[in-house]
């Protein structure tokens, strides 16, 4: 298992007055491992109050946080999910406050019980079967390959791709080369 410190205690963030009142009395920890581009905090330790997660996105990541809020609202009709406690959107920022789901992450279970990998895979498969059992005709969202590639190309054309963030194998490659190599791997191209 990785020995990365998965979260770090941090000071309370200042937000707008409506949200600040809801967050008074919580201890804060910042997530160190997410890859979404958002800043994520776990809020805990407030007596008689649920553990919460606060996600903040800026710029294009604010759109992703907004999309997550919309999808959570929709998906609650099909399965238990975190409750959205608060959502704030400004032209450049989005803040999403949700309850935490009780339990442990797959990573936490694997750290505690290294021999449980097969059980974790089985549990994830059950969850994915449930998710995939939702009829596609009920889903109002589009995130197919064509849509995502168009988003990626737009980001590339607007200079929003950070080439210094490429993996070791593609370190030093120009963005256009990564784009061309990725297209060679696409199914049905």
Residue ranges with predicted function:
Residues 29-144:
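ATP-binding pocket architecture of kinase catalytic cores
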Residues 13-25, 71-81, 189:
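Short charge-dense sequence patches
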Residues 7-21, 133-189:
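An alpha-helical support segment within catalytic cores of ATP-dependent transferases
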Residues 1-36:
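N-terminal charged segments
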Residues 3, 7, 116-119, 170:
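A general boundary/transition motif marking the beginning of the first structured unit of a protein
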């Amino acid at each position: 298992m990785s020995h990365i410190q998965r979260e770090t205690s941090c000071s309370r963030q200042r937000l707008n007055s409506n949200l600040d009142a809801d967050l008074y009395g919580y201890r804060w920890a910042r997530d160190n491992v997410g890859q979404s581009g958002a800043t994520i905090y776990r809020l805990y330790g407030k007596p008689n109050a649920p553990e919460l997660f606060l996600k903040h996105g800026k710029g294009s990541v604010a759109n992703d946080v907004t999309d997550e809020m919309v999808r959570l609202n929709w998906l609650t009709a099909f399965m238990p999910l975190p409750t959205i406690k608060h959502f704030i959107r400004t032209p450049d920022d989005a803040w999403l406050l949700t309850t935490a789901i009780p339990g442990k992450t797959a990573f936490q279970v694997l750290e505690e019980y290294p021999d449980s990998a097969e059980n974790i895979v089985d549990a994830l498969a059950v969850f994915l079967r449930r998710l995939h059992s939702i009829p596609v005709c009920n889903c109002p969202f589009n995130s197919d390959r064509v849509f995502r590639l168009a988003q990626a190309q737009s980001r590339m054309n607007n200079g929003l791709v950070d080439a210094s963030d490429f993996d070791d194998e593609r370190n030093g490659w120009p963005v256009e080369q990564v784009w061309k190599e990725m297209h060679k791997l696409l199914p049905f191209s």
